[in-house]
Structures are given as structure tokens and as C-alpha cells.
């Protein structure tokens, strides 16, 4: 099987291992206003605890505080559909979301103040089922109860349609169980409300579910079906995964559905702050990885991708100073 060759993604294979958002936005706004007089205070908007992005934000916040002298607050929200406009409006200084969510948000809402920092790491994902079931492939989901909807992460439905398309399925071929976000979907899976849930590898929630239900399995995706998947979502690709503590549920070498996770900011954040953020996370990668193993994939060169969202001037200066050219989509 020929999988997409990803030098930075291969690093993951080694080593161990929308209403609610208004409350989060208000809390973050209060924090930022109260700290306005304090220089270099940052708010990082992310998803709820247990998600991959919350762990990533926690790792970045710790490094920025300990290594760059920045006062940082991690602010959970209901989902990426909340995070992106929140950051664009300046109610958060930094946000983390997947590349598709960012593209759609900008196209729909004309978020002219949003600025890209870079692609922080790949986002490997899967449909998971109980290990005790006979389900092994995406095709086996036909007629099964599957999480769907994702009102706080609207573009997840697009990704799910792409994954289902790899086996000739559409959402109409499964029994849709509506959830607001992936964390709720995982909780419904544990409670027995669905047969399969969708999540990113490396998230604490995946480990929690695996331990709670006595083992989970990641469903295999046929490489031959990726042509159909790209008609739904062009940026998705299969990347290699092997059984290890990071890839929980992977029972043998296989390809897992992947795309990029982005770090972004807004036009009001000072250039030197963005420069300092990039410099700190690149230089202190080892510290990041102790908290978030997915950040093994982080490289300075990997940050600078081609994207429809303009880069923040601070990021542009960092890439220029370090002679890092832009690269195409993976």
C-alpha cells in the first residue's frame, strides 16, 4: 500500500505514547480586559478538555510562559466554529483549529482580521468502534449508529462524508446520531448510544474511552477509495500509522485519514509577539512533546504552508529571517 509520504508526519510513529462558546468568549474577554495593563498577556482559544487541541494549547501555553516569559490563559470553548470568529474579533489572541474549519469560516463569514501563524501538526483521525465487535472497515458502518451533526464543529461532517465515500457510503447509509462536538460523541459511545465515534489520535479522550470500554479499534480506510474522498474534501490524505501508544486502536500498519491543524491569530496582535510565539515553540519542541506527543511532527519548515488565510506579519518576518519558503498542501 502506498501512503502519502510525510517526513514530518513520520515523527508521530516513534516514541510512546455553538452556545456554550458564548460563555467561554465572555470569560475570555473579561480576562483580557482585566489584564490589559499587563504586557504580553495572551489568551489561547481551544476546544474542551480531553480533545487533542486542548492538550496542544496547554503544551504551548506552558512553553510560552516558562520559556518566553508570556502570561498565557488556555480558554476552552464549545468547538472550532466558535474559536475562529472569536480569535478574528480579537477576543482571543491565538486559536487552534483544523484547516478545513478555517477555510470554511473565512469563506462564509469574511473574517478579514484573521491571520495565520502556521500549520502546527498533522491531524490524524479515525472512526473508532469497540474492539469486541466484528466491525473492521468503513464499509462495516452501513446501517450502524454513527455520530453526526457536530453543530460546534460544522466541517467535521464534510470530513465524515469524505471518509464514508472511501467505501461507497453516504450519510444516508448510516443511522445518524446528532452531537455538538467530538467529545460529546465519544461520551455517547461510552454510554452505548452509538456504534462508532470519530476522534483525533493522541487525544486524552481516546485513551479514556479505550480504557473505559475495554478496548477500541480504528476502522481501516481503503486507499483505493481516496479518489472518491478527495471529491468531497481535497486536502485530506492517508498517512501511515502503526500500533503504538499514540495510535490507540490501530491493530496493524494502516493508513489513517489526516489533514493539517492550524495555529492562527488576528491582525491586532503585535508582530514581535507572534515572532516570539513561533520562536519559542520551535526552540522548545522537546518540552512541548512531553505534554502533547502529536507535536513531535512540529518543525519550523512545516509551519509555512500555502493557505487562503494571509500570514501575520510577525510570522512572515520569522520565515524570512530563517529562510523558510512556503510549501504546498500535503
Protein language model regions, located:
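N-terminal secretory signal peptides that target proteins for export/translocation
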Residues: 1-16
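Sec/Tat signal peptide C-region and signal peptidase I cleavage site
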Residues: 33-39
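Bilobed "Venus flytrap"/periplasmic-binding protein-like clamshell domains
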Residues: 40-67, 72-73, 123-191, 285, ...
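Extracytoplasmic
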Residues: 69, 79-82, 89, 112, ...
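Acidic, polar ligand-binding/catalytic clefts
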Residues: 88, 92-122, 204-207
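Pocket-lining segment of extracytoplasmic ligand-binding domains
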Residues: 98-101, 108-109, 133, 170-177, ...
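Ligand-binding clefts/hinges and TM-proximal coupling segments of bilobed small-molecule sensing domains
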Residues: 151-162, 237-307
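An extracytoplasmic/periplasmic, membrane-proximal ligand-sensing/linker region
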Residues: 183-184, 191-192, 200-218, 223, ...
